[in-house]
Structures are given as structure tokens and as C-alpha cells.
UniProtKB/Swiss-Prot annotation:
Record note on quaternary structure: Component of the RNA polymerase III complex consisting of 17 subunits: a ten-subunit horseshoe-shaped catalytic core composed of POLR3A/RPC1, POLR3B/RPC2, POLR1C/RPAC1, POLR1D/RPAC2, POLR3K/RPC10, POLR2E/RPABC1, POLR2F/RPABC2, POLR2H/RPABC3, POLR2K/RPABC4 and POLR2L/RPABC5; a mobile stalk composed of two subunits POLR3H/RPC8 and CRCP/RPC9, protruding from the core and functioning primarily in transcription initiation; and additional subunits homologous to general transcription factors of the RNA polymerase II machinery, POLR3C/RPC3-POLR3F/RPC6-POLR3G/RPC7 heterotrimer required for transcription initiation and POLR3D/RPC4-POLR3E/RPC5 heterodimer involved in both transcription initiation and termination.
Associated pathology: Immunodeficiency 101, varicella zoster virus-specific: An autosomal dominant immunologic disorder characterized by reactivation of varicella zoster virus (VZV) infection in adulthood after primary childhood infection with VZV. The viral reactivation manifests as central nervous system vasculitis with stroke-like episodes and lacunar infarcts on brain imaging. Features include headache, hemiparesis, impaired balance, and other neurologic signs.
Function statement: DNA-dependent RNA polymerase catalyzes the transcription of DNA into RNA using the four ribonucleoside triphosphates as substrates. Specific peripheric component of RNA polymerase III (Pol III) which synthesizes small non-coding RNAs including 5S rRNA, snRNAs, tRNAs and miRNAs from at least 500 distinct genomic loci. Part of POLR3C/RPC3-POLR3F/RPC6-POLR3G/RPC7 heterotrimer that coordinates the dynamics of Pol III stalk and clamp modules during the transition from apo to elongation state.
A GO biological process held by the record: innate immune response
One GO molecular-function entry: 4 iron, 4 sulfur cluster binding
Domain notes: The [4FE-4S] cluster-binding domain adopts a globular structure that serves as an interaction hub that connects the POLR3C/RPC3-POLR3F/RPC6-POLR3G/RPC7 heterotrimer to the Pol III core.
Cellular compartments per GO CC: cytosol; nucleoplasm; RNA polymerase III complex
Intracellular or extracellular location(s): Nucleus
Keywords: Acetylation, Antiviral defense, DNA-binding, DNA-directed RNA polymerase, Immunity, Innate immunity, Isopeptide bond, Nucleus, Transcription, Ubl conjugation
Keyword field contains DNA-binding: yes
Lineage: Eukaryota, Metazoa, Chordata, Craniata, Vertebrata
One Pfam family hit: RNA_pol_Rpc34
Protein name (record): DNA-directed RNA polymerase III subunit RPC6
Length: 316
């Protein structure tokens, strides 16, 4: 009598147990897991059962669907964001997750299209829907004024996007920067003059002429000339322009931890300096910087005899 082989089918796993195991794996790997990881951990579960469990977790808003270089990733969803995306389809959740991962630097729609692999028309529709729900917002970037980046609605855009204190509605505030430049230099000049008037030895005078970036920042804040809140980093940017102009020099000293104005045990000090070489006469005269220099000649519409800039300079 021939031997009869009977194929033993594994018992059907409880769908709830499969879902719980997938969630446990996601907690073990916070950055996300692939379908291969789930398959390796649960080899007895058929592909159809895995797909049903994953789709159910996605529909309940317990998992995020991400796309990486290696394929799709499943990541445990933040409980705070789960309620926000309730009722959204998987494509909308994917776009939201991509924007969330971009942080406060935002992401262009072109990059969203690349990461999601969705048609541009579908992405535009999803973006409008998310904007109407006030889940995301579009922000113009100073790097490319005609392009918008998308970020979560409650985020404050990064300085690289807005340009920081030096930009207003994507326009560079040159006059504001110039005023800050003058006031910072004025403060350091005053500090240097006070040191010279002390009549102490040269080394003490030199050390007394230095001011920390925190002192300069405090002085500017007390003047009240800025409508926006300036950080020490903003003031150091202004001080750097004075260094490039040859008006200020900087030195770095060691400082005790916790000292006001110190960073990582170091402190930046600045002082006003006199130029080593005086500027040439041509640079000081209006002709050296005149925007219509090439059109200026005697007998012409623009000439030295009727130059308003030369008249003002001579009267000064």
C-alpha cells in the first residue's frame, strides 16, 4: 500500500496577535522596519496575513508609511499626530510624514514628489487639503523667492528659510543692517576711548578696550533700535562685517563654564582698531566711488564743474 503524505497546515494566527507583534517590532526599531524584518520575525505568517495586519494598523493611524532607498518602511506613529491624521488616506499620511521629517527647514513639492513617488497633480491636491486643515503651511524661502517650502503648521521657520533678522518679506533690510553696524562700532569705539583715558599702562588699556559679544548685544537691546528680537549670533554676524572692514579685531579667550557670553568654555572679545594704512585720496574723494564715473567729462551733462557730490564733499 502506497504511503500517503498529508500536508499539515499551520494554525491560523490571531490577527490581533500579528498586529501586536508588528507594533512591538516597531517599538524595537524606532526608525522603522521593512516587510522583510516582519517576515523574518514571523516566518509562519503568510504574506496575505501580514498585508491585512499592516493595512489595518495604517488605517487605524498606529503606523506611518515611509519610503526609503531600500523600499517601504513602517514606523510607529506619534500618539499626538495620530489624532490629526484621523480619516486621512495612506497617500495623505505619507505626504504629511515626509513634511514632518523635513522639520523647520521645510521641503519643496518637487522633493515630496521624489520621496513619495506620487503624481504631481495628486501631491498638489494633498498639499491644498493639508493646508486647509491647518496641518501644514507654505513658506517663501529667501534662497528662491519664487519657490515655497512646506512645513508643519506650528513650526517656526529656520533662519536659512526666512533669512533671520536681516530680511522682511524676502527683502534684505540693508538700512537696518547699516544702523546696527554703526551702533556696534560706536560702542566699541567708546570702550576704546574710555580705556585710553584711564592713563594706565598699555597692556591694561588694551585689555580694557575689549568687549564681549554679550556686552555688545546688551547695548543694542537697550538702545531699542530693533523691532525684531536679536540674538547674540545676529550681533556676532554684524561684528564679523566690521572685522572684514578692518574696523574691529576679535580674540578668543578661555572662560569658566557658565560665564555669561561663553560657549563651550570660550568667549569672543572684540575691540575697535585704527586702520594700519590710511585710505588713498581717490577712495576718499567722491570720484572713487561714483556710480556715473564713466559718463563724467568736462562740457557734458555730468561734469566735475557741476558735480553735486564733489560740492558736498568739499563743504564737509
Amino acid at each position: 500500500m502506497a504511503e500517503v503524505k498529508v500536508k499539515v497546515q499551520p494554525p491560523d494566527a490571531d490577527p490581533v496577535e500579528i498586529e501586536n507583534r508588528i507594533i512591538e517590532l516597531c517599538h524595537q526599531f524606532p526608525h522603522g522596519i521593512t516587510d522583510q524584518v516582519i517576515q523574518n520575525e514571523m516566518p509562519h505568517i503568510e504574506a496575505q496575513q501580514r498585508a491585512v495586519a499592516i493595512n489595518r494598523l495604517l488605517s487605524m493611524g498606529q503606523l506611518d508609511l515611509l519610503r526609503s532607498n531600500t523600499g517601504l518602511l513602517y514606523r510607529i506613529k506619534d500618539s499626538q499626530n495620530a489624532g490629526k491624521m484621523k480619516g486621512s488616506d495612506n497617500q495623505e499620511k505619507l505626504v504629511y510624514q515626509i513634511i514632518e521629517d523635513a522639520g523647520n527647514k521645510g521641503i519643496w513639492s518637487r522633493d515630496i514628489r521624489y520621496k513619495s513617488n506620487l503624481p504631481l497633480t495628486e501631491i498638489n491636491k494633498i498639499l491644498k487639503n493639508l493646508e486647509s486643515k491647518k496641518l501644514i503651511k507654505a513658506v517663501k524661502s529667501v534662497a528662491a523667492s519664487k519657490k515655497k517650502v512646506y512645513m508643519l503648521y506650528n513650526l517656526q521657520p529656520d533662519r536659512s528659510v526666512t533669512g533671520g533678522a536681516w530680511y522682511s518679506d524676502q527683502d534684505f533690510e540693508s538700512e537696518f543692517v547699516e544702523v546696527l553696524n554703526q551702533q556696534c562700532f560706536k560702542f566699541l569705539q567708546s570702550k576704546a576711548e574710555t580705556a585710553r583715558e584711564s592713563k594706565q599702562n598699555p597692556m591694561i588699556q588694551r585689555n580694557s578696550s575689549f568687549a564681549s559679544s554679550h556686552e555688545v548685544w546688551k547695548y543694542i537691546c537697550e538702545l531699542g533700535i530693533s523691532k525684531v528680537e536679536l540674538s547674540m549670533e545676529d550681533i556676532e554676524t554684524i561684528l564679523n562685517t566690521l572685522i572684514y572692514d578692518g574696523k574691529v579685531e576679535m580674540t578668543i579667550i578661555a572662560a569658566k563654564e557658565g560665564t555669561v557670553g561663553s560657549v563651550d568654555g570660550h568667549m569672543k572679545l572684540y575691540r575697535a582698531v585704527n586702520p594700519i594704512i590710511p585710505p588713498t585720496g581717490l577712495v576718499r574723494a567722491p570720484c572713487g566711488l561714483c556710480p556715473v564715473f564713466d559718463d563724467c567729462h568736462e562740457g557734458g551733462e555730468i561734469s566735475p564743474s557741476n558735480c553735486i557730490y564733489m560740492t558736498e564733499w568739499l563743504e564737509f
